[in-house]
Amino acid sequence: MKNLSFLTLFAFLSVGFVVADEPVDEDVEVVAEATMSESSDAADDEDVQELGRVSVTGSRIKRVDIEGATPLITITRADIDNAGFQTVYDAVSNLTQNTGSVNGENFQAGFNASLQPINLRDFGPGRTLVLVNGKRTADYPFPYNGESASFNWGAIPLAAVERIEVLTSGASSIYGSDAVAGVVNVILVDGLERQTARVVAGGGVNAGSGGETLNLEFAGGGFGERYSYTYALEYYDEKAVPISSRSEHDSYKDAQDGGLPSRGLLIRDQFAGAFNHYTPDELIDGLTAPFDPSSGLVPTAGLSCQDAGDYFAPTETEIGNYVPFAVGAWCAIDTSSNGSLTNERKRTAAFLSGTYELTDSVEAYAKYVYLETDTIGTLDNLFTPFVWVAGPQRYGRQDSYWRPNTSTNPATGGFQFDPGYSAFMDFRIQKIFPGVYRGSSYVEDTSTIDFGLRGVLNNGYEWDVSYTENTYDVVQTGRNFLASALYDKIHNIGGVDGFGNPCVLDTNDLLDGDPSNGEVDDWWGIYGYSASYSQPNCYNWDFYLSTQTQADAEALRVDNVEPADAFSELFQATLTGDLMQLPYGPLGFAAVIENQTKGYEVNLSELNKQGLLWGIGGVDGGGERERNAVGVEFNVPVSENVLISLSTRWDEYDDAVVDVDRRTAGATMEWRPKDNVLVRASWSESFKAPDLPYSFVGERRFFTSQTDWYQCWYDGNFGNGGENCGGAYGIINIEGFTTGNLGLKEEEGDSYAVGVVWEPMDRMVVTIDAFHIQLGDIVSTKSLGALTLDEAVCRARAAGDTLDAFPDYPDSYCSQVIGNIVRGGKDFTVNPTPEGSITQIYETPVNIAGQEFLGIDTAVSYAWVTDKAGDFNFSVFSSHQIDLKYAEDVGDPLLSYMNNTYTPRSRQSLRLGWSRGDWGAGMSVLRVGHMEYL
């Protein structure tokens, strides 16, 4: 389905749609990208105007020529309007260089369901530097994916934007950390002379498609003898796009493999490996576990899937596809269309700026931006945990043992079912609630104040001294099952069992509990299960086998409120001018001094911290860091048509524990063999300081299952590479923790670009640029499977076994790995290790990974001016990824991942525009190229 978005701006109409040879996202529109040689007003005036010296992103030295040594894209406010975009995020997310995948509002189950990030060149959201008026801002408060930093493009009001400049190559020698894949600089509006009102409405042409938008703007300003002022107000309202509105996603049958429905009501006999068999007419009680003392049967006879809720009986094919569960069946539910593709969002914003001339050579300026956003996202159907109804199986390893026969509940003295092998009971049950959904809401407040002085010295040098403060506050609210209430409901705690005994919780009911020594584990963990070993007759069948209303589910849930905040305080001073006159022109010079303090804090709720909520994780923590930087640039004209630029910068980061400093250098070249040809090249060292969350993230708790490679080696079954360590060495319900690492160092790399700009005729520009970006020592968390394997290798080598098939690990690494894996648990193997089985695993971020990008950007733009028919504009842009490589660990070779799922080969955009007097129309198209679907 193609969606058309209509823009009404006075008498202006814009239409946007998407095409692709393999449709990937048919609801995305693209920004009209323009090189700096292209002006939005170029077609309105055929007279060539003399340009003054201006400063553009990529260098602090002002220049006359708009095209320079570094590839730059400029998106003006007119370009945004012509493309039909209504937000800054729309504009930047549709850059052809935005080829990487992200987890934001498109992934409601993640840590950042209100975030709108971009990912240039697939280096990650945190490796593109974002500036506002050339100055750094605060990060999004919640860590990206729970571990790194990112910028939220939904936090900049469009009403305050004059243009967006995008440097598409690395530039750490100019801007410092984060400028790896590029720099995006948002220039705020200034110097308005009249009042302007905008009313913009958009939406899909098909009823119920969602995404309807309304944007109201009012802006104005004025000038006095020595002052100027500008203001803008904005209100933005966007409806959610439900998954059900997209025909390619509204049924489980849309999946490429034919699709399978979800198992909405599941009752599985673990011991028999079967399910109770449900048909459209009857829930057949094919299993005879003594849940009901009167009949000895599961109370499902005579029930249908429809009786238990909005379920349906799966087909025999669907049953068989759930291997190895083809013995029985289950009640099915279609959950594929639940949730939202984009959030419901309301935003209000205010912007105010002004200048005042203190003297003829000194000016004071100030800018203030405030934005409040309310966001609501929907994830999927509410569901219960898997529940073990009965059975004496104990999990410490993937082995089981029989608890001694007993007929007395130690807590109540009543009869309990555990008579021995003949009546072994072990049922796993889960229910997905029809019509009851999970989701979160976010309230965000951001404010920025920027004020300073700027002027011109007697020798012509221009200077600017400023202070910028940015704050970002977010409150996330969700509704989650209170674990105790859910447990009480499922197991009828407070009621009586089939024999009249009170239904209570005792140590036999706790997952992995050992009654002989009082050992218990939390059954309400993120991936934990509740159990009813002692009193299976207390199980609340009505909770599963009857229709549950939303009110029934809501009664078991509580609000979970978790705030987060981030801030940035920046002092910046710049100086630019001409040092001296050289034979071929002036020696340009620019210098910058910066001091920035930034920080963040995430506060999990006490319920979440204590593990009292079911089905939710989280990560808390916080910290701050001070950064000092000094940079300098020189423009050296070496001939009439060759200009060389040199830059260097020193950054020092102090997080009160570890100091990180980095010196970077860069160079660019411009060669103009003809008036209409520019050959350019650039190189810059790149670096990224460790993200604050990587260093200061609080403890994140989870549960995992892993192979005990060390036990396998200890038993003599390891072989050359652990190929004999199968399921017998698996351990489930290992408690895991993620913590920060204050000992991280900076990521380092290089960025290269070479290209040509050609103007074959008036008003036509062609550009071709090739890029090569390398980055090493990337901060990442090693997979838990790799950690447990490396632990075995380190312990084996310490015992004298060389294990030549594995790389050489330094002693420091082995000490860290062994320390991250906690042992001491009971081991029920014949030959247990002296250290015991794994009980806990700690993962910490480390500098281990590497990445490389090779690609080409091309662009063609043309403006055709007529006397009567109006003015026509045409632009087409393309970003082609030649190769993407990644290494997961130190010493690993860089391997191409171009054939990975959802890695696009290219992205193209097209813009068409027409204007005549007060009328105009525009169309923008985005194409996402071929990618693998595995």
Predicted regions and their residues:
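Transmembrane beta-strands of outer-membrane beta-barrel pores
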Residues: 201-205, 224-226, 235-239, 370-374, ...
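Transmembrane beta-strands of outer-membrane beta-barrel proteins
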Residues: 195-199, 229-231, 360, 364-366, ...
